[in-house]
Amino acid sequence: MTDEFLWIEGIPFPTVYYSQEIIREVRDRFVVRDEDTIIVTYPKSGTHWLNEIVCLILTKGDPTWVQSTIANERTPWIEFENNYRILNSKEGPRLMASLLPIQLFPKSFFSSKAKVIYLIRNPRDVLVSGYHYFNALKQGKEQVPWKIYFENFLQGKSYFGSWFEHACGWISLRKRENILVLSYEQLKKDTRNTIKKICEFLGENLESGELELVLKNISFQIMKERMISQSCLSNIEKHEFIMRKGITGDWKNHFTVAQAEAFDKAFQEKAADFPQELFSWE
């Protein structure tokens, strides 16, 4: 798996869509504006779901935008090679997304009033989702066995590096007024009130009917159908594993007892200082 990594500042990235030159340029030269909003996650943490929610909030629940425009055009990834230059020349408030850890994030953000929403998810479920997703991307190439993927994840040798370091970096900024940290599990458990919290953070107000439209259009099944219908717009043929289950606790169907114990030990060692209120998972 190591040969498939593009190593940037000690972080392993996929070799597709990313380049050392662009990542460093994003960090050092990309100008984040005060009116920008950026959705940040570690991969497979509910990224697509949160993107859809924010887009629907901005359109007052009207699904036209999310139905007619693919996600990467609505919320472009800052670090993608093709997106960086497009975003640089885009005028007005920008809605963007990123998977970058804080040490590679645009430096200009930290002196701006731009808003970041960071979504954290049970790393056990992140591991399982990533295992299925990244293996599916291989399409005919040799798959990474579950045991090896598990070990790589704990060692920070999976795409985008250590989950623990990524989460720790962003969580450490949670007291800043322009950063909102949410958990996938809480969003799943209490979607309505979590959306209200997002609205308050963004300065958006939804009438009751508009909120109901947002809730209707972010159900897992509707989002999956929407992605399938958009496959012709973007040549997406992998919607079935981009959105696999959308559930919590799936790790219990994959971890052995020994793996669960090993993960618990690693979590206690590496995440001891994390705020416990974020860990609403089983």
Swiss-Prot record:
EC number: 2.8.2.34
Effect of mutating residue 99 to H: Decreases sulfotransferase activity (at pH 6.27)
GO molecular function, one term: 3'-phosphoadenosine 5'-phosphosulfate binding
Keyword vocabulary terms for this entry: Bile acid catabolism, Cytoplasm, Lipid degradation, Lipid metabolism, Steroid metabolism, Transferase
Highest rank taxon of the organism: Eukaryota
Top enzyme class: transferase
Reported impact of residue 99 to T/V: Decreases sulfotransferase activity (at pH 7.5)
Induction field: Down-regulated by PPARA agonist Wy-14.643.
GO biological process: bile acid catabolic process; lipid catabolic process
Active site: 48 (proton acceptor)
Entry-linked SUPFAM superfamilies: P-loop containing nucleoside triphosphate hydrolases
Effect caused by changing residue 237 to A: Markedly decreases enzyme stability, both apo and ligand-bound forms. Markedly decreases sulfotransferase activity (at pH 7.5)
Catalytic activity: cholate + 3'-phosphoadenylyl sulfate = cholate 7-sulfate + adenosine 3',5'-bisphosphate + H(+); glycocholate + 3'-phosphoadenylyl sulfate = glycocholate 7-sulfate + adenosine 3',5'-bisphosphate + H(+); taurocholate + 3'-phosphoadenylyl sulfate = taurocholate 7-sulfate + adenosine 3',5'-bisphosphate + H(+); chenodeoxycholate + 3'-phosphoadenylyl sulfate = chenodeoxycholate 7-sulfate + adenosine 3',5'-bisphosphate + H(+)
Disulfide bonds: none
Effect of residue 239 to G: Has little effect on sulfotransferase activity (at pH 7.5)
This protein's pathway: Lipid metabolism; bile acid degradation
Protein family membership: Belongs to the sulfotransferase 1 family.
The name this protein goes by in its record: Sulfotransferase 2A8
Source organism of the structure: Mus musculus
Taxonomic placement: Eukaryota, Metazoa, Chordata, Craniata, Vertebrata
